[in-house]
Amino acid sequence: MDYQILSLRKGSALKDKPSDFIQKKVSADPKLFTCASYNSKFLWLGDQNGHIYSIDPQNGVVNRYEIPEIKQAISRLLVTESGLMYITTNDGAYEYNIGYKQLTKLPFTIPQEDSGIIFYDKYDKIWFQEGNHALIYYDPLNKSSHRFTFPNQNTIGNFEMQDAGEQGMFFLTPGGEILLFDRDKLEMTRINQLKPFSDDLPD
């Protein structure tokens, strides 16, 4: 399970329901859950069997999604406002259109032990964290991706992110480095060193 706490206010429709009301509707052993995410006003859970659950905290409605092509445990998941679900498993990364029930395998794989957070920016571009080693940028419209690898001495760890729109994406690493991502050039630069990452990578 993620090392995070998701605290959601219970809706008025659940006011008189027992504390285990939602758990019983999910009908799954909590020990099987592998990840959690709160997106599009729903709590999303992934489990070891490749199943995904959406829970409405306002009324307790639970939906279960079984995607036939996904058999592995869900490592991470993200759901966008447009109804696209992004999933990582040990077999790869996927985009799932909930409305059309259409699954697309993305052109990269992240090992389960390195699968970090998934998030999207102001321009609906998707970002995948690959452990402390890299960030993968994915453009859903153009179906393109780019991997930004970090030198070993400058791992990203639990970074902080600020989306500045046209100015770019700013990342602050635990080591105090400020990184700027240029969406037009698909380049990332260290602000406090003013040189691209490729200068530090081994030949």
Tell me what each language-model feature is.
Residues 1-203:
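Carboxylate-rich, polar loop motifs that coordinate divalent cations or form catalytic acidic clusters
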